Amino acid sequence: MKLTCVLIIAVLFLTACQLITADYSRDKQEYRAVRLRDAMRYSRVRRQCADLGEECHTRFCCPGLRCEDLQVPTCLMA
């Protein structure tokens, strides 16, 4: 009975340590340059919008346009 209680307490303690460590290291990355490069690449991709007549199923339409689902989703005048 004592051994069972000790094992349960040990498992709970180790679980708590794992959760604390995981939460502490969540936003840390060893290679910051890689993270920065990836962030810059994805921000450029996000800023590119589809112009008038371009497909909009993978990108948003530029301001003043709306995505109209004809046969192929296309950016048209709003």
From Swiss-Prot:
The lineage of its organism: Eukaryota, Metazoa, Spiralia, Lophotrochozoa, Mollusca. It comes from Conus arenatus (Sand-dusted cone). The modification Pyrrolidone carboxylic acid is found at Q48. Residues 1-22 form the signal peptide. Residues 23-45 form a propeptide. Belongs to the conotoxin O1 superfamily. This is Conotoxin ArMKLT2-0312. The presence of a 'disulfide through disulfide knot' structurally defines this protein as a knottin. The cysteine framework is VI/VII (C-C-CC-C-C). Disulfide bonds join C49-C62, C56-C67, C61-C75.
